[in-house]
């Protein structure tokens, strides 16, 4: 048996209560959003921005003020700088499209790839997780433009710089033995790299 309220004003009270609760909920969400925005906003900006490793166009291996360059492994950076100097003598300018990345920035790139390709397996062809990416440790760099990648594909071993993945002509890592033995065979893509299986 249903209980009804026939008291005067009972139906108005029932109509006002949800309205008041909705208003309070909206005020609470607004307050939380404001506080969160003040605290988390700058952190997110840092993760998304240069502090996290994001890079704009035209960055070179000599741009020490950029964390994506400054946080590269010192041996990798030395090799890149020597290669860039020699390439410049031939009219080729080597740009850094991506270098060191914070774990947060790398994870963001990974999640974007999962969303773009609609699967973790397909995304893994292009973007590693923060736990496995050599960018996070500063041991990998993505270079450009295409003239630079072509130049490094011909001369990279002289500097111990090797293209690691066949599907990523821009991705280079330091391979110390390359100077004597040449670059090792490339993996088809990152899914075939044992380091990515951790």
Where do the protein language model's features map onto the residues?
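Hydrophobic membrane-insertion alpha-helices, especially the h-region
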Residues: 19-38
């Amino acid at each position: 048996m249903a209980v009804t309220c026939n008291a005067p004003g009972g139906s108005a009270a029932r109509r006002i209560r949800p309205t008041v609760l909705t208003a309070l909920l909206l005020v609470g969400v607004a307050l939380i959003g404001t506080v969160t925005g003040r605290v988390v906003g700058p952190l997110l900006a840092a993760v998304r921005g240069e502090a996290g490793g994001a890079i704009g166009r035209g960055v070179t291996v000599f741009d020490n003020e950029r964390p994506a360059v400054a946080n590269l492994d010192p041996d990798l950076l030395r090799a890149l700088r020597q290669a860039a100097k020699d390439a410049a003598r031939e009219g080729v300018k080597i740009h850094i499209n991506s270098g060191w990345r914070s774990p947060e920035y790398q994870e963001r790139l990974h999640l974007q790839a999962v969303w773009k390709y609609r699967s973790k397996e397909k995304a893994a062809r292009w973007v590693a997780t923060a736990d496995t990416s050599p960018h996070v440790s500063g041991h990998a760099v993505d270079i450009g433009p295409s003239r630079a990648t072509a130049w490094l594909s011909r001369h990279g071993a002289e500097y111990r710089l090797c293209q690691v993945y066949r599907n990523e002509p821009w991705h280079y890592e330091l391979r110390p033995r390359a100077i004597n033995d040449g670059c090792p065979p490339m993996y088809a893509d990152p899914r075939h790299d044992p380091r990515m299986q951790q």
